[in-house]
Amino acid sequence: MEVIHGRPYCCRELEGADILSNTFYSNELHNPLQTVTRPTASEDRYQELRESLQQCRLPWGAEREYGGIIPISLPEDHRPKYEPPRVMGKGHQHYGFGGETWPRKLPVEQFYYLTQNKKSDVYGNDSLIPKPPNSTVGEICLPYPIEHPYHTHICRGAMFPTFTSPEDLYTGIKARTQQPFPPTVPTKAYDSTVLKTRGNPYRYELIDIPMDSKKKALTWPGQGVYYDFPRGVEKNKPVFYPKPPKTFAPNTSLNSWDPICSAKEANIQRNLERSHWLTSYTHDFTGLGPMDPLELDDYHEKMVAELTRKIGFDPEPQEKFHPVFKPPRPLEGRIARLIQNRRSLEAIVQQRPRSCPDCTPRVLCNFHTFVPSSKEMVALSDNIPAGVTHKNQDIEEKIIEEQSLLSTYELPSCYPTKDLTSIYDIKPFPKITDTKKTEDLYWRQQSLKTQPTPYCKPDHWIHYENLKSPLRDQYNMCPDPVSLSKPSVLQNKQDTEAFTLEHFLSKPEEELFLNMENNEETRPVLGWIPRAGVTKPQTNLLELKNSFSKTGAQKRFHKSILEDHKDLRDNEHSGMKHQFYGHNSYYFYN
């Protein structure tokens, strides 16, 4: 601190010692990580610090003692022409301060009439308090505040957070004031009176169970302050303590300084508290998936439902929305036209034209009366001897004429040899436009069954030229789908493919239908349809699953271990866990 100018008599000594003490001596050995050389590293360094930075002793003492150096207080009649210098406020000297006393003269005369306090004529000193022997102290029989008996074991704040709002309809102050109490408000314990005579070993209590209309709400004591009543003259006097600190009791109170608090916010806090009561099982398994977020702000809906008597007491918070299955809106069809406010169209049945216009469902024409059907061809194909002529040349010419007459009708195209989808002229499913009738569609698919049709349709007619056993002769398809001829050089196929196809065509229709259902190699064209009434074809994965054996796997695992089995009875002496009293367990066993 700098020296106060004009007052050299106060501070004439410097701070610090002239000689460096060994306590503050330091060098590189003591502080090797010190980057800057400390002022107390050596004696020369310390003297340089003393000369560069001179710190004088603080001017404590007369100015800071009782009275201190103050201007002289004189009445107006004794005011001098010039202001006198400052003197000591009291006439006694103070020892132990850093400066000199000023002045060292006679004590300063004190003038008590300069202030409002007057000198007392009763007491010999200036004390305004009466002497203890002469004072009369009377007892005041009033309750005084005391500390809670268990105040040292009570938390100063709330240990657990609370969601209760003072404006709550079911647990707030309004619910505590009404009679009878709602079931959400706890009541105070019953008053009990102890009737016990001194020396009697038994304890007698009288418990007063009031009616519901006279019960009181439960409150925590000590929120304001505890008061104790003074005892009588004969008994011991209470010990007075200072006023105890205020106890923080978890009682609800109206916060008048918070204008935002309202019944709507109290309802939100109540719903937030009820939402924490839900278990994880209730939240995740609702039957329709996980629970949606809860509607916390439903004060208006509750008020309307309470007026209409639609809800009970303290209802649980509801979800904001519920998952509902909504089918997709079809782009076309009857439902789409109804949604678009358009007129629905009448169903049009498309009838396929018959191959022969002269044939009727009951009566055939003259040509088809002697031409065998495809079933007859398949049945007779294996029994026709070689070299037998079935019809003459006139019949063949008539067949050619009939073909030329029926050339305007559309005939099926040529099929590949190995393509089963073209062999069976199957329409998988008609086009579905009414997508809302999902249940009808499901039962329709279940009842639908793929009916295999023969390769040679009964409506087609076949040439009887060169008709031989299909197992021996090789025939393949030509642009004319109903005629068979010998293979040419350009239409030559492999022997295995032709044999497979002819063998497939040579089977009867009933046997062919059974093979379609039972044979694993011959599967439906559309594959397996879920929920269509047909079992799903098994794969090799099920066989692999059934072939696994846990016992066999364990046996193979034990056989793969070439080392000897470990004997658990052997004593192990290595490791940190085998140290006892600083010695290894090896020395105890051996």
From Swiss-Prot:
Role description: Microtubule inner protein (MIP) part of the dynein-decorated doublet microtubules (DMTs) in flagellum axoneme. May serve to reinforce and thus stabilize the microtubule structure in the sperm flagella.
Name assigned to this protein: Sperm-associated microtubule inner protein 4
Short name of any one Pfam family annotated for the protein: SPMIP4-like
PANTHER family linked: C5ORF31, CHROMOSOME 7 OPEN READING FRAME 31
Classification via InterPro entries: SPMIP4
Tissues expressing this chain: Predominantly expressed in the testes.
Glycyl lysine isopeptide (Lys-Gly) (interchain with G-Cter in SUMO2) crosslink location in chain: K427, K545
The organism's taxonomic lineage, starting at the top: Eukaryota, Metazoa, Chordata, Craniata, Vertebrata
GO cellular component, one term: cytoplasm
Keywords assigned by UniProt, alphabetized: Cell projection, Cilium, Cytoplasm, Cytoskeleton, Flagellum, Isopeptide bond, Phosphoprotein, Ubl conjugation
Source organism of this protein record: Homo sapiens (Human)
Compartments (UniProt record): Cytoplasm, Cytoskeleton, Microtubule organizing center, Centrosome; Cytoplasm, Cytoskeleton, Flagellum axoneme
Major site of localization recorded for this protein: cytoplasm
Record PTM Phosphotyrosine, positions in chain: Y442
Modified residues (Phosphothreonine): T219
Modified residues (Phosphoserine): S407, S422, S485, S547
